[in-house]
Amino acid sequence: MTADRWAGRTVLVTGALGFIGSHFVRQLEARGAEVLALYRTERPQLQAELAALDRVRLIRTELRDESDVRGAFKYLAPSIDTVVHCAAMDGNAQFKLERSAEILDSNQRTISHLLNCVRDFGVGEAVVMSSSELYCAPPTAAAHEDDDFRRSMRYTDNGYVLSKTYGEILARLHREQFGTNVFLVRPGNVYGPGDGYDPSRGRVIPSMLAKADAGEEIEIWGDGSQTRSFIHVTDLVRASLRLLETGKYPEMNVAGAEQVSILELARMVMAVLGRPERIRLDPGRPVGAPSRLLDLTRMSEVIDFEPQPLRTGLEETARWFRHHTR
């Protein structure tokens, strides 16, 4: 399937002013799609950048309000070919720990309203950004897509994980009961340009960049041995669109092949910024799963490109960070 698969199609993107959603908007518009960009929180600079694109229409919508979502679909649905669902309440480990109830409530309402509208208004296909965090118990081997709630389901007080699990179960049931053509993407840790630092919920890479660029030490929660796989946001978007183009699998892990410890990551961030190594470990803070290794067999079958190495992506991200935060 070539890039012109998206030319002339109308794609609705939720969370369009968010980190991942904004990259979907840009890539889809560049490939010839008409993009209906739904957002809730104002971000004036990004809004202006996206509004300047030829085929992007920004629409403020409260996805947690069913009447607001239905109103938007009633007006827009006749032209929608595809829905890309990126909107979610998210944050770092501390944010998820402190606001689990809010996250669960917000995310489960959002996905419920969206899938109901995809069904009721006859949208042809949808892709949902899920999470690799739903593999609650880290397996000894790489987690395959089948190693989810269907194989082992247990309670967790992590509202984010619960919300993503609920969303996947609901999507699966919509697929089975209503024939909804819905796909699920489970990313590793996503990073790249556009992921600004928010002290209250910032992800690991922008948090490290902010500290290192300011000449401060990087604080690592735990002993730094916990490992993650990272995926550049543009590679995530490309892989997700390829999944829609091929329709090969209902669920797919998306991540880089490299497994990097958080301590190694901190050293890499310091190096790309040209800063001396200043790192402090804090064993008393929440660290999440000790590892999150993903089976990438499906992804390797679907994509037609090579994801960029972490070091290369970090260098680009650091350049963006310095240009946009000074």
UniProtKB/Swiss-Prot annotation:
Please indicate which superkingdom the organism of origin belongs to: Bacteria
What Enzyme Commission number(s) apply to this enzyme?
A: 1.1.1.364
Record-linked Pfam families: Epimerase (PF01370)
Catalytic activity of the protein? dTDP-6-deoxy-alpha-D-allose + NAD(+) = dTDP-4-dehydro-6-deoxy-alpha-D-allose + NADH + H(+); dTDP-6-deoxy-alpha-D-allose + NADP(+) = dTDP-4-dehydro-6-deoxy-alpha-D-allose + NADPH + H(+)
Instruction: List ligand-binding residues for NADP(+).
Output: 15-21, 129-132, 164, 187-190
Class in the EC hierarchy, top level:
oxidoreductase
Which molecular-function annotations from GO does this UniProt entry contain? Answer: oxidoreductase activity
The catalytic site is made up of Y160 (proton donor/acceptor)
The organism named in the record is Streptomyces bikiniensis
Family assignment from sequence similarity: Belongs to the NAD(P)-dependent epimerase/dehydratase family.
Please report the name of this protein according to its UniProt entry.
Answer: dTDP-4-dehydro-6-deoxy-D-allose reductase
Which PANTHER family does its entry note?
A: DTDP-D-GLUCOSE 4,6-DEHYDRATASE-RELATED (PTHR43000)
Q: Which processes are annotated in GO (biological process)?
A: antibiotic biosynthetic process
